[in-house]
From Swiss-Prot:
Protein's GO biological process: symbiont entry into host cell; viral penetration into host nucleus
Name of this protein: Nucleoprotein
Region (Disordered): 1-21
Family membership noted in the UniProt record: Belongs to the influenza viruses nucleoprotein family.
Species the sequence originates in: Influenza A virus (strain A/Memphis/5/1980 H3N2)
UniProt cross-references to InterPro entries, sorted A to Z: Flu_NP (IPR002141)
UniProt PTM: Late in virus-infected cells, may be cleaved from a 56-kDa protein to a 53-kDa protein by a cellular caspase. This cleavage might be a marker for the onset of apoptosis in infected cells or have a specific function in virus host interaction.
Pfam families associated with the record: Flu_NP
Top-rank taxon: Viruses
Length: 498
């Protein structure tokens, strides 16, 4: 990439750092993890949770959500100004699950946001520690990506549900900063831009006045983030067109959808980080592990090692399969919702199934669900091998892919060819190459036509034994090509919107 000099590594985004060396980055990320861990320990004490209850992923999600809500300044301001019945803008809470007389009970807790902020800051040496908050947002986003298929959101913005491999990070809040922007997929950025343009079409004043100036600069910033994710000159030139438009409208929406479709073959670079639930960091810190001193990376072996030695439990509904629940959470932990299942099966050491074949609903339990028959079980989050996370789209390639999802977005930097259904993707590009972007469109289509099935991505990269911490002996996996590669294959996963 030509602009490599100006790109910051994610750890730098993660640490607001000016150029740091690897050791400083590892210490800095470790410090963030320490803070989350200390906060979690303190919250478990406040809530009087037993060790087992503290390792329950549902409790972890509630505690994470409470602190994210306590620091959501815009929403807090909004709630103060628009009071709604029965909602105290100064309080936050959620369901906490406890084991009472051999049964799981739900208890709704409520805390002052101020108190939660105090506990968080105290755990983070008095800082607001926004990076730790963003880290938890990305974990929630990865869990959503693995649990739900954003069919409706795609259709609403005029995209095709089969483009779901482009939707990483589609539920990340706007306030998730540079680290959040790095993990957003092409489709997510396109969707945000289309929503913005549609508002501009419907609301005369959207681009006008003092507010309009802010809106415009946000629009251009988002265009630039998206441009930075594309890896070909023609796709980037198209983004310049969209960004420079005097009055963004339907022509821009067309161009954006075109560029999103093209990303199924000419993939963009999207960062992947293994963000784990707070209930993994807490026990590690309380056992005396010093993340800052030891150093930690979100893209190397560290999360794998941590999960090898962690006990995490989950509530299981009566007709759910605990192994399937484990797969869901394992994929979320490694930000692997859109990775090739054959590679995931190889790394995990057990078969990873498409979403539609899993007998499990989401991890969260709704407030109206009956607790009487709830069991709990251990989540199996260990792996057979580990691999380095990638932020490139890999080169392009085509292969028999599935009806539901017609491309993948690689998570791991491991040699393989990347499946996508070329004929299906190309069928979307009939005809429309006129207009201002015609030469770019023609160029993009030409590159897509040229994508060859035998091309291998991440050549020479492999997975590593868990004992191989320095990544010295790459093992290049061999795949059974008859297997299905896509997770959301012909799928019936619940949609996130419900």
């Amino acid at each position: 990439m030509a602009s490599q000099g100006t790109k910051r590594s994610y750890e730098q985004m993660e640490t607001d750092g000016e150029r740091q060396n690897a050791t400083e980055i590892r210490a800095s990320v470790g410090k963030m993890i320490d803070g989350i861990g200390r906060f979690y320990i303190q919250m478990c004490t406040e809530l009087k949770l037993s060790d087992y209850e503290g390792r329950l992923i549902q409790n972890s999600l509630t505690i994470e959500r409470m602190v994210l809500s306590a620091f959501d300044e815009r929403r807090n301001r909004y709630l103060e100004e628009h009071p709604s019945a029965g909602k105290d803008p100064k309080k936050t809470g959620g369901p906490i699950y406890k084991r009472v007389d051999g049964k799981w009970m739900r208890e709704l807790v409520l805390y002052d946001k101020e108190e939660i902020r105090r506990i968080w800051r105290q755990a983070n040496n008095g800082d607001d520690a926004t990076r730790g908050l963003t880290h938890m947002m990305i974990w929630h986003s990865n869990l959503n990506d693995t649990t739900y298929q954003r069919t409706r959101a795609l259709v609403r913005t005029g995209m095709d549900p089969r483009m779901c491999s482009l939707m990483q990070g589609s539920t990340l809040p706007r306030r998730s900063g540079a680290a959040g922007a790095a993990v957003k997929g092409i489709g997510t950025m396109v969707m945000e831009l289309i929503r913005m343009i549609k508002r501009g079409i419907n609301d005369r004043n959207f681009w006008r006045g003092e507010n309009g100036r802010k809106t415009r600069s946000a629009y251009e910033r988002m265009c630039n983030i998206l441009k930075g994710k594309f890896q070909t000159a023609a796709q980037r030139a198209m983004m310049d067109q969209v960004r420079e438009s005097r009055n963004p409208g339907n022509a821009e929406i067309e161009d954006l959808i075109f560029s999103a479709r093209s990303a199924l073959i000419l993939r963009g670079s999207v960062a992947h980080k293994s963000c784990l639930p707070a209930c993994v960091y807490g026990p590690a810190v309380s056992s005396g592990y010093d993340f800052e001193k030891e150093g930690y990376s979100l893209v190397g072996i560290d999360p794998f090692k941590l999960l090898q030695n962690s006990q995490v439990y989950s509530l299981i509904r009566p007709n759910e399969n605990p192994a399937h629940k484990s797969q869901l959470v394992w994929m979320a932990c490694h930000s692997a919702a859109f990775e090739d299942l054959r590679l995931l099966s190889f790394i995990r050491g057990t078969k990873v199934c498409p979403r539609g074949k899993l007998s499990t609903r989401g991890v969260q339990i709704a407030s109206n669900e009956n607790m009487d028959n709830m069991e709990s079980s251990t989540l199996e989050l260990r792996s057979r091998y580990w691999a380095i996370r990638t932020r490139s789209g890999g080169n392009t390639n085509q292969q028999r892919a599935s009806a539901g999802q017609i491309s993948v977005q690689p998570t791991f930097s491991v040699q393989r060819n990347l499946p996508f259904e070329k004929s299906t993707v190309m069928a979307a590009f009939t005809g429309n190459t006129e207009g201002r972007t015609s030469d770019m469109r023609a160029e993009i289509i030409r590159m897509m036509e040229g994508a060859k099935p035998e091309e291998v991505s991440f050549r020479g990269r492999g997975v590593f034994e868990l004992s191989d911490e320095k990544a010295t002996n790459p093992i290049v996996p061999s795949f059974d090509m008859s297997n299905e590669g896509s997770y959301f294959f012909g799928d019936n996963a619940e949609d996130y919107d419900n």
